A protein has these predicted regions:
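A cross-kingdom C-terminal cell-surface attachment/processing module
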Residues: 213-225
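A surface/secretory-pathway sequence property marking extracellular, secreted
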Residues: 1-15, 51-53, 58-67, 103-145, ...
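Beta-strand-rich interaction surfaces with strong enrichment in secreted/lumenal proteins
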Residues: 19-24, 78-79, 137-143
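Short beta-strand elements of extracellular/lumenal beta-sandwich folds
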Residues: 72-103
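Low-complexity, intrinsically disordered segments enriched in Ser/Thr together with acidic residues
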Residues: 38-39, 86-93, 139-166, 175-178
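Short, acidic/polar linear motifs in exposed loop/turn regions
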Residues: 40, 96-100, 111, 159
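Extracellular/surface recognition and adhesion modules
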Residues: 34, 48, 90-92, 107, ...
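Extracellular/luminal low-complexity Ser/Thr/Pro-rich, glycosylation-prone repeat/linker regions
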Residues: 7-10, 14-24, 29-71, 161, ...
């Protein structure tokens, strides 16, 4: 019979299928249970959403909540636009859609140039030498089948008269693993390929709110008889 056992090869420990010692003679071995089974599926999925946007300016602080929005819209009064600070809170959800537990060892956020990062409000994130944001807080947290782990990331945009429009932010699973070293069935971590389910984009559209002025005039009609 075959059992699963941890085997170390060149200081690399993995699980392998191991049999008892099989002695080969001049006779054939029959009824050997090799225990071959089809590999379980490993599949981690990542989705990125906008969960909250906070606007700070001379008029005060306003907070707008969003429910799993991947296209969030925000309007700022034209008189308050320049100098407004916009804090965008993203929710990154990693879900195990496969058949065996696994790990999201590293998450990467490809921060766009119009957003700024602060380590003071993002304790689990850091800027790497590649210029991107990285998070390894889930390295040792097993994600069971059907389970979802959630990360948050808050980025800041300082508004001017000329930088309204769409901000696109993408996150991806940079490294993933499982005890059987089975690769993800439909994604390659960290390869920046759109369309794979370990990568997701959230967009924020910031526009100007303009007031409408109504003028009521008086029409005088003179009738000459």
């Amino acid at each position: 019979d075959v059992i699963t056992s941890k085997v170390s090869i060149n200081n690399d420990t993995k699980k392998y299928a191991v049999t008892d010692t099989l002695e080969l003679t001049d006779k054939e071995l029959e009824n050997i249970d090799a225990g071959f089974i089809e590999n379980e599926v490993f599949d981690l999925n990542l989705n990125k959403y906008v969960s909250r946007i906070t606007v700070q300016n001379k008029a005060g602080t306003t907070v707008k909540e969003y429910n799993k929005e991947q296209l969030a819209k925000l309007e700022i009064d034209s008189k308050q636009l320049a100098g407004s600070t916009v804090l965008i809170e993203y929710e990154i959800r990693i879900t195990n859609e496969g058949e065996l537990p696994g790990y999201a060892n590293e998450i990467v956020d490809y921060i766009p140039t119009d957003l700024k990062f602060s380590s003071e409000i993002n304790k689990d994130w850091y800027i790497s030498t590649d210029g991107n944001l990285h998070n390894t807080s889930l390295t040792n947290d097993v994600i069971d089948v059907g389970e979802t782990k959630i990360l948050t990331l808050t980025l800041t945009k300082t508004m001017t008269e000329n930088n309204t429009g769409t901000t696109v932010n993408t996150a991806e699973i940079a490294k993933a693993s499982n005890e059987l070293s089975i690769p993800d069935k439909d994604s390659t971590p960290g390869n920046k390929v759109q369309g794979e389910d370990d990568m997701s984009t959230a967009e924020v559209i910031i526009s100007i709110r303009t007031g409408l002025a109504f003028t009521i005039g008086t029409i005088v009609v003179i009738i000459i008889l």
